[in-house]
Amino acid sequence: MARILIKNGRVWDGEKFFFADVLTEDKVIAKIEKNISDDADYVFDATDKTVSAGLVDIHVHMKGIASEEFGIEPQMSSFPFGVTAVNDAGSAYGDRALLDSFAVKNTVFVGVDARDNHADFTVTEELLQKYGDKAIGIKVYFDTTLTEVRDITPLKEICDYAKSKGLKVMVHCSNSPTSMAEIVNTLSAGDILTHIYHGGVNSCTENDFEAFKIAKDKGVILDAGFAGHVHTNFRNLEKSIKSGYLPDTISTDITCCSAYKRGGRYGMTMCMSMAKTVGMSEEQIFQAVTSAPAKVLGKENEWGYLKEGRCADMAVFDYTNEGFHLTDNDGNRLHSPTGYRCVLTVSDGQVIYRD
């Protein structure tokens, strides 16, 4: 296998930034140190660029695993944006063999039905069998426009079921029938609340960000789940960041509907650019797309870190005039003349994307 040397970059190893070269050999990171002199098969000059651990997207919808209306080809929606590992949120189709066939590393949160304000685990049980140990959680659409939920009852049932199975819970909370605070009070440490900056009823700003305070105390994970502009109100996002309520993880919720809008550039790099525009630091941003989601998924020993001896999953980013101009569903605008751009992605020690 080709030996890859990335020179002169600012390295993000999942915990901190520092300047060094990175050498890969036989699918692993062989060296991270300054001034590596090596006759590598492939040399990339990362001057003025960031060399990061491969990004981890905790909320995607993969073709063949998600519904036909939503699923997107996983490699095309990941590698060009520096993402080397993903978690499908709401899996309902396909099987373990299909998941294993994808080049991008993956886990899944299986779907669950809610009928007449009660959870139905019939399909969930079947999916858990089909996906095997790839299934690490349950995704709940706690949304009155999508499922038959009227109060907290079905969510309590789902949380009890998940706990009995040793699974995590991820809750889509847009258009929920209860307050965000009540949702968080029902979840356990390590469970995930996604679309936290939505602009509908029962939003994060109620009672001076009460839900976020409870989540931080309980250890419930706050996931941005930006979905471009669909599940994100830019004013709520800006207010939250200015008040110190940052997301634990940044994810795309990318689908075949969102990926090819906005010039076909929507992906993790745009989400990172949005976060930087509203005031998150680079340390906070890169942690939220590498080590933090890896830990949430229980994959911190495999994903999210750039360390010697670890799997050679990494990406190189530039911060350029690749800006964006977005309008959310409530008419609020967010724009920047600059943004992140992935210029190289390495997965399992192979160059898998080059800009």
Question: Which ranges hold each PLM region?
Answer:
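Histidine-rich, glycine-flanked metal-binding segment
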Residues: M1-S52
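C-terminal cap of metal-dependent C-N hydrolases
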Residues: G9, C311-D355
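Divalent metal-coordination and catalytic microenvironments
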Residues: G9, K27, D48, H59, ...
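Metal-associated gating/positioning segment near the N- to mid-region
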Residues: A46-F102
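Active-site gating loops and adjacent loop-to-helix segments of metal-dependent hydrolytic enzymes
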Residues: A53, M76-T84, K105-V110, K130, ...
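Short, acidic/polar
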Residues: S67-S77, N117-K130, P177-I183
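Active-site core of metal-dependent hydrolases
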Residues: V140-K239, G244-K261
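His/Asp/Glu-enriched, well-ordered alpha-helical/loop segment
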Residues: N236-Y319
